[in-house]
Each structure stands twice: as C-alpha cells, then as structure tokens.
Amino acid sequence: MKEDKVLILRTCANNMADHGGIIWPLSGIVECKYWKPVKGFENGLTGLIWGKGSDSPLSLHADARWVVAEVDADECIAIETHGWIKFPRAEVLHVGTKTSAMQFILHHRADYVACTEMQAGPGAPDVTSEVKAGNRSLPVTDDIDATIESGSTQPTQTIEIATYGSTLSGTHQSQLIAGYGSTETAGDSSTLIAGYGSTGTAGSDSTLVAGYGSTQTAGEESSQMAGYGSTQTGMKGSDLTAGYGSTGTAGDDSSLIAGYGSTQTAGEDSSLTAGYGSTQTAQKGSDLTAGYGSTGTAGADSSLIAGYGSTQTAGEESTQTAGYGSTQTAQKGSDLTAGYGSTGTAGDDSSLIAGYGSTQTAGEDSSLTAGYGSTQTAQKGSDLTAGYGSTGTAGADSSLIAGYGSTQTAGEESTQTAGYGSTQTAQKGSDLTAGYGSTGTAGDDSSLIAGYGSTQTAGEDSSLTAGYGSTQTAQKGSDLTAGYGSTSTAGYESSLIAGYGSTQTAGYGSTLTAGYGSTQTAQNESDLITGYGSTSTAGANSSLIAGYGSTQTASYNSVLTAGYGSTQTAREGSDLTAGYGSTQTAQENSDLTTGYGSTSTAGYDSSLIAGYGSTQTAGYHSILTAGYGSTQTAQERSDLTTGYGSTSTAGADSSLIAGYGSTQTAGYNSILTAGYGSTQTAQENSDLTTGYGSTSTAGYESSLIAGYGSTQTASFKSTLMAGYGSSQTAREQSSLTAGYGSTSMAGYDSSLIAGYGSTQTAGYQSTLTAGYGSTQTAEHSSTLTAGYGSTATAGADSSLIAGYGSSLTSGIRSFLTAGYGSTLISGLRSVLTAGYGSSLISGRRSSLTAGYGSNQIASHRSSLIAGPESTQITGNRSMLIAGKGSSQTAGYRSTLISGADSVQMAGERGKLIAGADSTQTAGDRSKLLAGNNSYLTAGDRSKLTAGNDCILMAGDRSKLTAGINSILTAGCRSKLIGSNGSTLTAGENSVLIFRCWDGKRYTNVVAKTGKGGIEADMPYQMDEDNNIVNKPEE
C-alpha cells in the first residue's frame, strides 16, 4: 500500500504538451516552475483524480496521449471542475490510449485506496475527502466490482437481458445484453453486449461488446469491442477492438485494435493496431500498428508501425515503421523505418530507414538509411545512407552514404559517400566520396573523392580526388587530383594533379600537375606541370613545366619549361624554357629558353634563349639569344643575340648581336652588332655595329659602325663609322666616319670623316673630313677637311680645308684652305687660302690668300693675297697682295700690293703698290707705288710713286714720284717728282720736279710753290750744279 499518494488521469497533445505548454515526459517526474497554490487551471499541473469526474477538460482527439500519474496527496488542491485537482509536481507512470490508461487505474487503484481511507479524519482537506469518497457521480472508467475481479463467484446459468424486438441465443454460462432490435448468438461461457440494431455471433469463451448497429462475429476464445455501426469478424483466439463505424476481420489468435471508421483484415497470429479511419490488411503472423487514417498491408510474419495517415504495404517477414502521413511498400524480408510523411518502397530482404518526409525505393537485398525529407532509390543489393533532405538513387550492389540535403545517383556496383548538401551521380562500378555541399558525377568504374563544396564529373574508368570547394570534370580513363577550391576538367585517359585553388582543363591523354592556386588548360595528349599560383594553357601533344606563379599558353606539339612567376605563350611545335618570373609567348614550331624573371614572345619556327630577367618578342623563323635581364623584340626571320641586361628590337629578316646591357632596335633586313651597354636603333635594311656602351640610331638601308661608348644617329641610306666614345648624327644617305671620342652630325647626302675626339656638324649634301680632336660645322652642300685639333665652321655650299690645329669659319658658298694652326673666318661666297699658323677674317664675297703665319682681315667683296707671316686688314671690295712678312691695312674699295716685309695702310678707294720692306700710308682714294724699302704717306686723293728706300709724304690731292733713297713731302695740290737721293718738300699749290742726270738725259728741274716761286714749306735739294737746293737743317 502506498501512503499519501493518489492517481490522476489527464490527456496531452501528440507531442506530450498540456494546455499550459508544459511537455510531460513518457515516464518520470514533471514539475511546474510557476506553481501557485490557488484554485484554477493556471500556474500548476492538473488531472482527474482516480479518473472520475467531469471529462470536459480531456482531449477527445484521436492522437491524444492519455497519461496516468502519481501525485502527493498533501500537495493537491481541489478546483472548481468536478473531480479535477491541481498540484505542483507528479510522476508519470503510464502513457497510452484511453482504454490502456483506464485499465491501468483500474488495476492499480487498490494499492492506494486503503491508505487514503486510513488517513481520512476530522480536519482533513477537501481533496482528501474526495479521495476517500472516490466521487463516482461522473464516471470516466467503469466501477470496480471486487466480486467479479476476485473470481469468488461463478455464474451458473445464462443471463439474457434484452429490450423489445431483440433475439438472444446463448449456451450455458453465457451473458447476453442487447438493445432493441438486436440479435445475439453466443457459445459457452461467452459475454455479448450490444446496442440496438446490433448483431453478435460468438463462439465459446468469447466476449463481444458493441455499440448500436454493429455486427460482430467471433470464433471461440475471442474478444471483440466495437463502437456503433462497426463490423468485426474474428476467428478463434482473436482480440478485436474498434471505434464506431469500423470493420475488423481477423484470423486465429490475432489481435486487432482500431479507432472509429477503421478497416482491419488480419491472418492468424497477427496483431493490428490502428487509429480511426485506418485500413490494415495483414497475413498470418504479422504485427501492424498505425495512427488514424493509415493504410497497412502486410504479408506473413511482418511487422508494420505507422503514424496517422500512413500507407504501408509489406511482403512476408517484413518490418515497417513509419511516422504519420508516410507510405511504405516492401517485398518479403524487408525492414522499413521512416519518419512522418515519408515514402518507402523496398524489394526482398531490404532495409530502409528514413526521417520524416523521406522517399525510399529499394530493390532486393538493399539497405537504405535517410534523414528527414530525403529521397532514396536503389536497385538490388544496394546500401544507401543519407542525411535529412537528401536524394539517393543507386543501381544494383551499390553503396551510397550522404549527409543531409545531398543528392546521390549511382549505377550498379557503385560506392558513393558525400557530406551534407552534396550531389553525386555515378554509373556502374564507380566509387565516389565527397565532403558536404559537393557535386560528383562519374561514369563506369570511376573513383571520385572530394572535400566539401566540390563538383566532380568523370567518365568511365576515371579517378578524381579533390579538396573542399573544388570542381573536377573528366572523361573516361582519367585521373584527377586537386586541392581544395580547385577546378579540373579532363578528356579521356588524362591525369591531373593540382594544389588547392587550382583550375585544370585537359583534353584526352593529357597529364597535368599544378601547385595550389594554379590554372592549367591543355588539349589532348599534353603534359603540364606547374608550381602554385601558375596558369598553363596547352594545345595537343604539348609538354609544359612551370614554377609557382607562372603563366604558360601553348599550342599543339609544344614544350614549355618555366621557373616560378613566369609567363609562357607558344603556338604549335614550340619549345620554351624559362627561369622563374619569366614570360614566354611563342607561335608554332618555336624553341624558347629563358632564365628566371624573363619575358619571351615568338612567332612560329623561332628559337629564343634568354638569361634570367629577360624579355624576348620574336616573329616567325626568328632566333633570339639573350643574357639575363635582356629585352629582345624581333619580327619574322630575325636573329638576335644579346648579353645580359640588353634590349633588342628587330624587324623582319634582321640580325642583332649585342653585349650585356645593350639596347638594339632594328627594322627589317637589318644587321645590328653591339658591345655591352650599347643602344642601337635602326630602320629596315640597316647594318649597325657598335662597341660596348655605344648608342646607334639609323634609318633604313643604313650602315653604322661604332666603337665602345659611341652614339650614332642616322637617317635612311646612311653609313656611319665611329671609334669608341664617339657621337654621330646623320640624315638620310649620309656617310659618317669618326675616330674614338668624336661627335658627328650630318644632314642628308653628307659624308663626314673625323679622327678621334672630333666634332663634326654638317647640313645636307656636305662632306666633312677632320683629324682627331677637330671640330667641324657646316651647312648643306659643304666640303670640310681639317687636320687634327682643328675647328671648321662653314655655311652652305662651302669648301673648307685646314691643317691640324686650325680654326675655319665661313659663310655660305665659301672656300677656305688653311695650313695647320690657322684661323680662317669668312662671310658668304668667300675664298680664303692660308698657310699654317695663319689668321684670316673676311666679309662676304672675299678672296683671301695668305702664306703661313699670316693674318688677314677683310670686309666683304675683298681680295687678299699675302706671303707668309703677313698681316692684311681691309674694308669691303678691296684687293690686297702682300709679300712675306708684310702688313696691309686698307679701307673699302682699296688695292694694296706689297713686297715682302712691307707695311701698307690705305684709306678707302686707295691703291697701294710697294716693293719689299716698304711702308705705305695713304689717305682715302690715293694711289701709291713704291720701290723696295720705301715709306709712303699720302693725303687724300694723292698718287705716290717711289723708288727704293724712299720716304714720300703727301698732302691732299698730291702726286709724288721719287727715285731711290728720296724723301718727298708735299702739301695740298702739289706734284713732286724726285730722283736719286732727292729731298722735296712743297707747300700748297706747288710743283717740284728734279730729275737731273745729264750723263745721258733726264734733266727736268722744275720748281714752283707759292705765288712767286719756291719757298713754301722747304726743304728741296738738288745740287751739283743743277741747283735748287734749300735743304733744311739736319
């Protein structure tokens, strides 16, 4: 006997929740966290004490759970609804149907009643009095009849109770009770109870209870209970229980329980349990349990359990378990388990397990396991396992395992394993393994392994392995391996291996190997190997090898090899080799080899070789060879060879050779050869050769040769040759030749030749020739020739020739010729000729000729001729002729002629002729003629003629004539003529003539000065009898 305890009856929803939202356990303690000891249903747990009282708070839904719990009597509070009590906690002892719950209270009530009655006394609470009284005014369960339960008395005769219109037939010890219009027929020891209009037929030892309008037929030792309007038919030993409007048919020793409106048909030794509105059909030895509205069909020895609204069809020896709303169909020997809303179809000897909302279809000998919302379809001998929301389809003898949300489709003898959210499709004999969120598609006999989030597609006989987030696509016979986040696409019989984050695309018969983050694309029968972060693209029959971070693109029949960080692009039949960080691009049949950090681009049939850090670009049929750090660019049929750090650019049919650190640029049909550190630029059909550190620039059809450290710039059809350290610049059709350290600049059609250290600048159609250390500058159409250390500057159409150390400067159309160490400067249209060490300066249209060591200065339109060591200075339009060591100075329009060691000075329009060692000084427009060693000085407009060693001085407008050793001095308007050793001095308006010598003529003694005759400005002389002597004091 249990002390201070009572039993309560209540109902919960299908999920064991009460009206307050508290979830009751299937067994054990339940407690209200918000307990308040006040009357009312809220803030506590409630129940119907002893199952007796008002049934209004109880749920009459077909899926309601009937709960029996044990409660401490001291914690109970009676509430308004009759028979209902409130309590803070309880212990669940039984959960089942209404019938099982009432039977539980009926069978265990005796363990509590005595204790309750014993404790009742004065002052006990109201609830205790209710417990003692048992309050039977509104019974929910039948009263307990102690006499019948204990079996102390046995009926000894048949009891028949019927209303009008009933027919009762019972054998010994039967009890028949029927409403009006009923018919009951019972065998020995049977009990039949029916409402009006019912029909009951029972064998011996049977019990039939039915509502009105029911039909019950039972074999011996059977038990049937049915609501109104039900039909029950059971063979011996059967137990049928059904709600109103139900139909139950059972074989021997079967047990059928169904809610109202149900239909149950069972073979012998079967057990069927169904909610209302259900249909169950089972062969012998089967066990079917279904919720309301379910349909169950089972072969012999099968077990079916389903929630409400389910449909189950099973062959013999099958087991099916399904949640509500599920559909299960299985052949013999199958085992199906599914959550609510699932659909399972299985062949013989199959096992299916699925969560709610799943669809499973399996052939014989298959095993399917799926989470809720999954779809699985398998042929015979297959094993499928999938998480919720998955779809699995398998051929015979296949094995599929997938996480939730996955889709798997497999041919026969395939194996698939996938994480959640994956998609796998495989033909027969394939093996697929993928992480969650992956997609795998495989042909026959293929093997696929992938990390989560991967996509794999393979033809037959393929093997694919990929890290998470990868994409692999392969035709038959391919082998693909990729790290996470990779993409691989392969034709048949290809092999691809890639690190994580790589992309590989290959035609049939190809082999691709790539580090992480690489991209490889290859046509059929190609072999690609790249380091991480590389990009490779290859045509058919190509072989590509690259270090990490490289980019390779090749057409068919190509071979590419590159170090890390390289870029290679090749057309068909090419061979490319590059060090790390290189870039190579080649058309068909090319051969490229580069060091690390290089860039090579080649047309078809080309060969490129470069050291590290080089850049090569070539058209077809080209050959490029470069040292490290070089740049080479060539059009078709070119041959380029450069040292390290060089830059070469060539047009078609060109040949370029350069030392390290050089720069070469050439048009087609060009030949460039350069030492290290040189720069060469040439248009088509050019030939450039330079030493190290040189710079050459040429137009088409030019030829440039330069020593080291030279600079050459030429227009088309030019020829330039320069020693080391030279600079040459020429327009078209020019020819320049310079020694080392020279500078040459020429216009078109020019020819320049210079020794080392020279500087030459020429306009078009000029010819310049200079010794070493010279400087020549000429306008167009000039010819300059200078010795070493000379300086020549000429206007257009000029000709300059100078010895070494000379300086020549001329205007246009001038001719200058000078010995070494001379300085010549002329205006336009002048002719200057000087010996060595001379200095000539002339205006335009002048002609200067000087011996060595001379100095000539002339204005325009002058003509100067001087012996060596002479000095000539004249105004414009003058003519000066001087002997050696002479000095001539004249105004414009003067004519000076002097012997050696003479000095002539003339004003403008003067004419001076002097013998050697003479000195002449003339006023403007004077004419002087002197013998050797004479000294002449004239006023304006005078004419002086002197013998040797004479001194003549004249005033304006005078005429003086003297023999040798004479001295003549004249005033204005005078005429003086003297002979040997004579001295004449005249004033104004004078005429003095002494010419005496009567040895044989010339006498002429004439004198005239002032008004009356001689006197004027003294002295005049003659003597020796010919008189006129008045010589001044010595």
Swiss-Prot record:
InterPro entries: Ice_nucleatn (IPR000258). PROSITE patterns: ICE_NUCLEATION. It is found in: Cell outer membrane. Its main location: membrane. The keyword Membrane applies. It comes from the Bacteria. Pfam families: Ice_nucleation. Residues 261-286, 311-334, 357-382, 407-430, 453-480, 580-592 have a biased composition (Polar residues). Residues 162-993 are annotated as: Octapeptide periodicity. GO terms for cellular component: cell outer membrane. SUPFAM superfamilies: Phage fibre proteins. Residues 260-287, 311-342, 356-383, 407-438, 452-480, 570-597 are annotated as: Disordered. GO terms for molecular function: ice binding. Keywords: Cell outer membrane, Ice nucleation, Membrane, Repeat. A structural model is suggested in which the ice nucleation protein displays a symmetry related to that of ice. Belongs to the bacterial ice nucleation protein family. Contains imperfect repeats of a consensus octapeptide A-G-Y-G-S-T-X-T; further on a 16-residue and a regional 48-residue periodicity is superimposed. Ice nucleation proteins enable bacteria to nucleate crystallization in supercooled water. This is Ice nucleation protein InaU. It comes from Pantoea ananas (Erwinia uredovora).
